[in-house]
């Protein structure tokens, strides 16, 4: 099938709200010509994908052409909003408006431990309400969902149950395939393409609980500012982070770049954990394994184990606490970090993080 062909009458040219008449020929011609899409065209394309009307060839061409052109924040905003509109909704008011997500794009090519998952548990134990969005492994041996499942956490809960989990335990988990069933149309294409595309950005941008704060890891330094622009448009309080060693986390092996999003603005900063007393780690210190191996590491850290993994977990949990503090216009950068690091360390040392994980497991067992 030629890329400009339409597979059905339903895929014929349509006029997105407020935008130009659109077809795959027009969308792909603009992208392959190196031009940004007109307003509404990215939304049109994503709706075609989410409703199953786009062919695999059209999905692949769109993903690759958008990546080569380099997506803009405006385009990614449209893609993410359409995806959220197709997601399972939460009941109005079910999730409090100061929740935090801790998640990364993946795709850094390094099989690290599930640092964001551990950091989410620690941040929740420090008193920050967490609603984490995640999935099974794509490029690593064990994704956050795989590790949580191995720990005994239920990952198959729907919106009402996740909202209860956040309210009663302090943390909840939105399993991406359950909340985004329409996104399945991209799965085979993404696997077959085998290289990162704009779709890698969408997971952290489409938490169906719509948290207002987050520590968001981006493995692609050139696209981190695009993600930050999306969060700025939402007026979220977010730290978009890229380890200068390539990790989609705050790293302890070197410095990280942070795009601090607050009150609709974006500031780019270089962050050195050595300034807070963290010793330099080696990347090998942070490597993970399968779900069983990673779950054992979670238990060891939450039980009070010392070393580079704990350091990385405390650092990332503190980053989430800082992002949460940023929901207040009174938050100051260095004091917020000092507070976040102290609270994250105390959550482990007091046993609060270990106890929270046990409560989370029991919550799922009792449903």
Swiss-Prot record:
The UniProt entry, under InterPro entries, shows: Anthranilate_Pribosyl_Tfrase, Glycosyl_Trfase_fam3, Glycosyl_Trfase_fam3_N_dom, Glycosyl_Trfase_fam3_N_dom_sf, Nuc_phospho_transferase
Query: A Gene Ontology biological process annotation?
Result: L-tryptophan biosynthetic process
Query: What pathway is this protein a component of?
Result: Amino-acid biosynthesis; L-tryptophan biosynthesis; L-tryptophan from chorismate: step 2/5
Q: Where is this region: Disordered?
A: 1-24
The Swiss-Prot or TrEMBL record annotates one GO molecular function as:
magnesium ion binding
Cofactor comment in the record?
Answer: Binds 2 magnesium ions per monomer.
What is its cofactor? Mg(2+)
Q: Which of this chain's residues are annotated to bind 5-phospho-alpha-D-ribose 1-diphosphate? A: 104, 107-108, 112, 114-117, 132-140, 144
Q: Which NCBIfam families match?
A: trpD (TIGR01245)
Binding partners and assembly: Homodimer.
State the function annotated in the UniProt record: Catalyzes the transfer of the phosphoribosyl group of 5-phosphorylribose-1-pyrophosphate (PRPP) to anthranilate to yield N-(5'-phosphoribosyl)-anthranilate (PRA).
The protein's matches in PANTHER family, at most eight in alphabetical order, are given as:
ANTHRANILATE PHOSPHORIBOSYLTRANSFERASE
What name is this protein filed under? Anthranilate phosphoribosyltransferase
Task: Give the originating organism.
Answer: Mycolicibacterium paratuberculosis (strain ATCC BAA-968 / K-10) (Mycobacterium paratuberculosis)
Its ancestry begins with:
Bacteria, Bacillati, Actinomycetota, Actinomycetes, Mycobacteriales
């Amino acid at each position: 099938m030629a890329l400009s062909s339409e597979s059905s009458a339903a895929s014929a040219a349509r006029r997105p709200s407020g935008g130009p008449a659109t077809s795959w020929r027009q969308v792909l011609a603009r992208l392959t010509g190196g031009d940004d899409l007109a307003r509404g065209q990215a939304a049109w394309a994503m709706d075609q994908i989410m409703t199953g009307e786009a062919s695999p060839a059209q999905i692949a061409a769109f993903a690759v052409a958008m990546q080569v052109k380099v997506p803009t924040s405006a385009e990614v905003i449209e893609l993410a909003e359409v995806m959220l509109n197709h997601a399972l909704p939460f009941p109005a008011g079910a999730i409090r408006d100061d929740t935090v997500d801790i998640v990364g794009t993946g795709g850094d090519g390094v099989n690290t431990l599930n640092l964001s998952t551990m950091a989410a548990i620690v941040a929740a134990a420090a008193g920050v309400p967490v609603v984490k969005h995640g999935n099974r492994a794509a490029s690593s041996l064990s994704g956050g969902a795989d590790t949580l499942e191995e720990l005994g956490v239920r990952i198959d809960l729907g919106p009402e149950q996740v909202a209860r989990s956040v309210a009663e335990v302090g943390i909840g988990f939105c399993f991406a395939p359950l909340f985004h069933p329409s996104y399945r149309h991209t799965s085979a294409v993404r696997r077959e393409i085998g290289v990162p595309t704009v779709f890698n950005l969408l997971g952290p941008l489409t938490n169906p609980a719509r948290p207002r704060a987050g520590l968001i890891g981006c493995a692609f330094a050139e696209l981190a500012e695009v993600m930050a622009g999306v969060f700025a448009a939402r007026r979220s309080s977010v730290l978009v982070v890229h380890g200068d060693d390539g990790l989609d986390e705050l790293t302890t092996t070197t410095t990280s770049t942070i795009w601090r999003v607050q009150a609709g603005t974006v500031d780019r900063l270089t962050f050195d954990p050595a300034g807070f007393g963290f010793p330099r780690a080696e990347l090998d210190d942070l490597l993970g394994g399968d779900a069983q191996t990673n779950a054992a590491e979670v238990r060891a850290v939450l039980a009070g184990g010392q070393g580079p993994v704990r350091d990385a977990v405390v650092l990332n949990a503190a980053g989430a606490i800082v992002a949460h503090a940023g929901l207040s216009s009174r938050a100051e950068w260095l004091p917020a970090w000092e507070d976040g690091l102290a609270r994250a360390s105390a959550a482990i040392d007091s046993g609060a993080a270990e106890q929270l994980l046990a409560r989370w497991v029991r919550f799922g067992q009792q449903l």
